[in-house]
């Protein structure tokens, strides 16, 4: 199976071209065709020799993903189901924000973190995505607009889709550097957010990388007992270890950390828990931000329900009174398979049911 050309960084592209006996500027031409002109085949690279195009075709594909399903919401949110070369499925989501077009990318097929409220974890991790497969998600979303003649550009990226980004650390870091490259998509570092469920050692590594992207941490509870019951990962990285890493990150980068907090009715959304969260954040209050997330119900996790608006606002008001910067996240795509992993999970379920019907037919 040939790799995607998107899997190469610009420096790797230069090294590849030189290994083929080509001049360095040929790599710059290929890079421009891919990321500025956004062609979908090597044959469209009209200033390259036939010999070089043949080498590219022999060694790479452009985009390895196949579009299976597109769902468009009334609010402009677009959810994509892509098929990988090995037949596995991933999701990507485009969200229209007041500040631009934001794309949420997937980094793994399935997830091993085991959050008890999440559709992504219903299917265990099967493999990591490589850099090319992650970049391809952005390029296909951009193609969606290019083909419609819409003069719109992906401006923001959130690495919050299926999987734990820091469990696929090297490929995610390579992806960030690829899309941030000023000769390519040139998406600003401060327009890129990487999320983690709390791999403390990787947060420390990330602090030392020198990338100026945003960090978000899925917290979802203010104490160990509750967090462990919601997120299995807390057994390995309890709050004390997690916050030591977060404080190291803030001291090293002087960058703000966003805390994601999903609102589960009568589970983690009480006023006392809001006070506990404010106390937890008191030492990093100036460089922290809490994102309160309305819960999208998942049928397989029917022990949870969405917090009523009055409980959400009481939680929000308590944080505010205690000096915590916070916001209630705007919802997107509520009329489609909105929860992370839901479209993929539902599609796989339908595919299995279809296969069973076909197998029993005479």
Curated annotation (Swiss-Prot):
Co-factor: note: Binds 1 [4Fe-4S] cluster. The cluster is coordinated with 3 cysteines and an exchangeable S-adenosyl-L-methionine.
GO biological process: rRNA base methylation; tRNA methylation
Residue spans crossing the bilayer: none
Disulfide bonds: 104-340
Keywords per UniProt: 4Fe-4S, Cytoplasm, Disulfide bond, Iron, Iron-sulfur, Metal-binding, Methyltransferase, rRNA processing, S-adenosyl-L-methionine, Transferase, tRNA processing
UniProt EC number: 2.1.1.192
The Radical SAM core domain, residue ranges: 97-329
Uppermost EC category: transferase
Family in the record: Belongs to the radical SAM superfamily. RlmN family.
Function, in words: Specifically methylates position 2 of adenine 2503 in 23S rRNA and position 2 of adenine 37 in tRNAs.
Misc note: Reaction proceeds by a ping-pong mechanism involving intermediate methylation of a conserved cysteine residue.
Name this protein carries in UniProt: Probable dual-specificity RNA methyltransferase RlmN
Organism encoding this protein: Streptococcus gordonii (strain Challis / ATCC 35105 / BCRC 15272 / CH1 / DL1 / V288)
GN (gene name): rlmN
């Amino acid at each position: 199976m040939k790799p995607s050309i998107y899997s190469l960084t610009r420096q790797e592209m230069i090294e590849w071209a030189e290994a083929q006996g080509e001049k360095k500027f040929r790599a710059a031409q290929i890079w421009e065709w891919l990321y500025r002109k956004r062609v979908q085949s090597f044959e469209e690279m009209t200033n390259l020799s036939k010999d070089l195009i043949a080498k590219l075709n022999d060694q790479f594909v452009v985009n390895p993903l196949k579009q299976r399903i597109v769902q468009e919401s009334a609010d402009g949110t677009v959810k994509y189901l892509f098929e990988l070369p090995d037949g596995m499925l991933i999701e990507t989501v485009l969200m229209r924000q007041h500040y631009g077009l934001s794309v949420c990318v997937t980094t793994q097929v399935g997830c091993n973190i085991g959050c008890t409220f999440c559709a992504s974890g219903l299917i265990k991790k099967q493999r990591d995505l490589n850099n090319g497969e992650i970049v391809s998600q952005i390029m296909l979303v951009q193609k969606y607009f290019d083909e419609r003649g819409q003069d719109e550009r992906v401006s923001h990226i959130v690495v919050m889709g299926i999987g734990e980004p820091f469990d696929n650390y090297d490929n995610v870091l390579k992806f960030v550097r690829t899309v941030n490259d000023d000769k390519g998509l040139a998406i600003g570092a401060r327009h890129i957010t990487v999320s983690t469920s709390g791999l403390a050692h990787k947060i420390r590594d990330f602090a030392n990388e020198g990338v100026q992207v945003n960090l978000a941490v899925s917290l979802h509870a203010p104490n160990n007992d509750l967090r462990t019951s919601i997120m299995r990962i807390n057994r390995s990285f309890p709050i004390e270890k997690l916050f030591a890493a977060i404080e190291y990150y803030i001291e090293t980068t002087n960058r703000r950390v966003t805390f994601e907090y999903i609102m589960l009715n009568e589970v983690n959304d009480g006023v006392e828990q809001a006070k506990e969260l404010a106390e937890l954040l008191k030492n990093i209050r100036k460089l922290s931000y809490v994102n309160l997330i309305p819960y999208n119900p998942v049928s397989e996790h029917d022990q949870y329900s969405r917090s009523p608006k009055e409980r959400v606002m009481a939680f929000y008001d308590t944080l505010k009174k205690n000096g915590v910067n916070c916001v209630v996240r705007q919802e997107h795509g509520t009329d489609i398979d909105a929860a992370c992993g839901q479209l993929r999970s539902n599609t796989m379920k339908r595919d299995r049911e279809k296969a069973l019907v076909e197998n029993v037919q005479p």
